[in-house]
UniProtKB/Swiss-Prot annotation:
Pfam families: Ribosomal_L28. Gene3D superfamilies: Ribosomal protein L28/L24. The keyword Flavoprotein does not apply. Keywords: Ribonucleoprotein, Ribosomal protein. GO terms for biological process: translation. One of its GO terms (cellular component) is ribonucleoprotein complex. It comes from Chlamydia trachomatis serovar A (strain ATCC VR-571B / DSM 19440 / HAR-13). This is Large ribosomal subunit protein bL28. The keyword Ribonucleoprotein applies. GO terms for molecular function: structural constituent of ribosome. HAMAP family: Ribosomal_bL28. The lineage of its organism: Bacteria, Pseudomonadati, Chlamydiota, Chlamydiia, Chlamydiales.
């Protein structure tokens, strides 16, 4: 199952999870030190939604991110779908 947004193209990113030790300088310590670094993935908030398209006069079932859902609220579904098709998502 793909974890990519159909409207914005957001997909999982790679990064690190840091293990930190020490007492912060604010608490009169010598500062926080990174003692370990583990690879991890950051996943977008993808959900399956049924949205009504006025142009096609039917429901569209899309896997979209929370950011795309806010875009749909702001611009309307048909405009966001047209933008996604032009960008190739």
């Amino acid at each position: 199952m793909s974890k990519k947004c159909a409207l914005t193209g957001r997909k999982p990113r790679r990064g690190y999870s840091y293990a930190i030790r020490g007492i912060s300088k604010k608490k009169k310590g010598i500062g926080l030190k990174v003692t370990g670094r583990t690879k991890r993935r950051f996943f977008p908030n993808i959900m399956t939604k049924r949205l009504w398209s006025t142009e096609e006069n039917r429901f569209l079932k899309l896997k979209i991110s929370a950011a795309a859902l806010r875009l749909v609220d702001k611009l309307g579904l048909d405009q966001v779908v047209a933008r996604a098709k032009s960008k190739g998502f």
